[in-house]
């Protein structure tokens, strides 16, 4: 099995391990290295969320540091496009969760659809665990202080 990495897992990894003042590139690199035993991918929606962080950075230095982290990450973890098959899975999940009155944010739905389409688990941060657990037939792994 592989793992689809959600933005919340990347944020949690950085908060758990980043030394004050660090750019975080080494932190993400060490953490992603732990996933070497299985394939890991980033959904296109996660890549988009990361790029928003670059574009909304309050200084050019911070924008450059964020872009460097993303570039380092995507050298080791490929981005999976949101193509027709994943879009259909997204629609199935939307319909299911909508009928149950348990919709989750659209980007997180795209992450879940990517994981289900690939037959992968999804790695999330503690902040997003509850709503990912609403998704049927999705193996949710939560990044904690233990790794």
What do these predicted regions represent?
Residues 1-42, 55-71, 147:
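Short, well-structured N-terminal submotif of metal-dependent ribonuclease cores
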Residues 5-6, 43, 104-105, 126, ...:
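Histidine- and aromatic-rich ligand-binding microenvironments
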Residues 10, 47-50, 87, 129-132:
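A generic structural signal for short hydrophobic patches within well-formed alpha-helices
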Residues 12-14, 53, 90, 135:
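Residues that scaffold the ATP/ADP-binding catalytic core of kinase and kinase-like folds
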Residues 52-55, 76-123:
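Active-site neighborhoods of divalent-metal-dependent phosphate/nucleic-acid chemistry enzymes
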Residues 58-61, 97-98, 139-143:
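Short, hinge-like loop/turn segments at secondary-structure boundaries
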């Amino acid at each position: 099995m592989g793992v689809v990495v959600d933005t919340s897992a990347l944020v949690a990894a950085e908060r758990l391990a980043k030394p004050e003042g660090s750019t975080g590139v080494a932190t993400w690199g060490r953490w992603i290295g732990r996933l070497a035993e299985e394939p890991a991918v980033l959904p296109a929606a996660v890549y988009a969320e990361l790029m928003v962080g670059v574009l909304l950075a309050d200084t050019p230095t911070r924008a450059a540091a964020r872009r460097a982290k993303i570039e380092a990450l995507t050298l080791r973890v490929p981005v999976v496009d949101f193509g027709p098959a994943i879009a259909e899975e997204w629609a199935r999940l939307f319909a299911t969760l909508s009928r149950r009155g348990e919709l989750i944010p659209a980007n997180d739905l795209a992450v879940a659809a990517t994981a289900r389409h690939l037959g992968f688990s999804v790695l999330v941060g503690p902040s997003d665990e509850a709503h990912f657990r609403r998704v049927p037939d999705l193996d949710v792994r939560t990044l904690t202080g233990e790794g």
